[in-house]
Every structure is written in C-alpha cells, then in structure tokens.
Amino acid sequence: MYTSKQPFLKSKQPFSKSKQTFNKSKQPFRKSKQTFRKFKQPFRKSKQPFRRRPRIGPGDRIDYRNMSLINRFISEQGKILSRRINRLTLKQQRLITLAIKQARILSFLPFRNYENEKQFQAQSISIITGSRPRKNRHIPQLTQKYNSNRNLRNYNQNLRNNNRNLSSDC
C-alpha cells in the first residue's frame, strides 16, 4: 500500500490538444421539408379603400365637460374601455381616462351604471341557469349572501369569546 504523498511534478511538455477529432455524424442536420414558399401572386388590395374613421376628431377637445365625447369611451356597465377597443393613441387614451375620472369625481358621470349592471347580472344568471348543466358554477349573489352569513356568525362567536374572557378576568 502506497501511503506517502509525493509532490505534484509539473511536466515539461506543454499541454497539447488531443489529435482525435470529434466524431460528427455523417448526416447534416435536416431541415423540415416544408419551407416557406414565396407566393407568386402579390397580395391583392381591396378595390375600395377602407379607412376607419378616428373616434376623436381633430376639433374635439378632450375635457371632462365634453360628455358626448366621454360617453363614447365608457362601457354599458360604466367602465372605461381599453385602448384596443377604443383604437386610440396612448396619449389620447390617457387624456380620456383622466377626463372620465375627473367627470366622475365632479359627479358629471356615475362611477357605475347600476341600471345596465342589473341587466348584465340578470343576463349572466340566465346564462348560468341555462339548459346545459354546468359544474361548480356559483351565482355571485348566493355566494355573497353565504359569505355575509358566515362573517356574521364569526363576528358573533368572537363577541361571545370576548365576553367570556372579560367575565373570567373579573
């Protein structure tokens, strides 16, 4: 058994890479046979040019008092529509959003449109209770009622526990 340690001796020959080459496979990497084919016919434009009119005209002022303009950018539930739906530039959307918020604060606009929201809830409930049975679908009003009852129960239980603790301390 060899137990003594010998110091590491540096070899005098410089390190050289092995002469063996990496054995590459003979077949090159195959590209899929479906390549993008260039269409021989150019893209056909429609005969009548269609240009979407901008929602905000050049003379329209984006202001909280301009209710006819602001109402175009609010949904039926009273929510601010997204930029994709509005087709506005970022700057225009920002100005519209600020104008809507300002109009809401100054009570020119309601924060929510409750009449249309009730109709929307009725439609969603009729969709849920349609002919096709759906699993694990809760009607929001029922879960809200259940949660409020549970919260009330927890509140009463906490009151009882506090009263017991107070009476035991005396």
UniProtKB/Swiss-Prot annotation:
<keyword id="KW-0934">Plastid</keyword>
<dbReference type="GO" id="GO:0009507">
    <property type="term" value="C:chloroplast"/>
</dbReference>
<dbReference type="Pfam" id="PF01084">
    <property type="entry name" value="Ribosomal_S18"/>
</dbReference>
<dbReference type="GO" id="GO:0006412">
    <property type="term" value="P:translation"/>
</dbReference>
<keyword id="KW-0699">rRNA-binding</keyword>
<feature type="compositionally biased region" description="Basic residues">
    <location>
        <begin position="27"/>
        <end position="55"/>
    </location>
</feature>
<dbReference type="GO" id="GO:0070181">
    <property type="term" value="F:small ribosomal subunit rRNA binding"/>
</dbReference>
<dbReference type="GO" id="GO:0003735">
    <property type="term" value="F:structural constituent of ribosome"/>
</dbReference>
<comment type="similarity">
    <text>Belongs to the bacterial ribosomal protein bS18 family.</text>
</comment>
<feature type="region of interest" description="Disordered">
    <location>
        <begin position="1"/>
        <end position="61"/>
    </location>
</feature>
<keyword id="KW-0689">Ribosomal protein</keyword>
<feature type="compositionally biased region" description="Polar residues">
    <location>
        <begin position="13"/>
        <end position="26"/>
    </location>
</feature>
<dbReference type="InterPro" id="IPR036870">
    <property type="entry name" value="Ribosomal_bS18_sf"/>
</dbReference>
<dbReference type="GO" id="GO:0005763">
    <property type="term" value="C:mitochondrial small ribosomal subunit"/>
</dbReference>
<dbReference type="InterPro" id="IPR001648">
    <property type="entry name" value="Ribosomal_bS18"/>
</dbReference>
<protein>
    <recommendedName>
        <fullName>Small ribosomal subunit protein bS18c</fullName>
    </recommendedName>
</protein>
<dbReference type="InterPro" id="IPR018275">
    <property type="entry name" value="Ribosomal_bS18_CS"/>
</dbReference>
<keyword id="KW-0694">RNA-binding</keyword>
<comment type="subunit">
    <text>Part of the 30S ribosomal subunit.</text>
</comment>
<keyword id="KW-0687">Ribonucleoprotein</keyword>
<keyword id="KW-0150">Chloroplast</keyword>
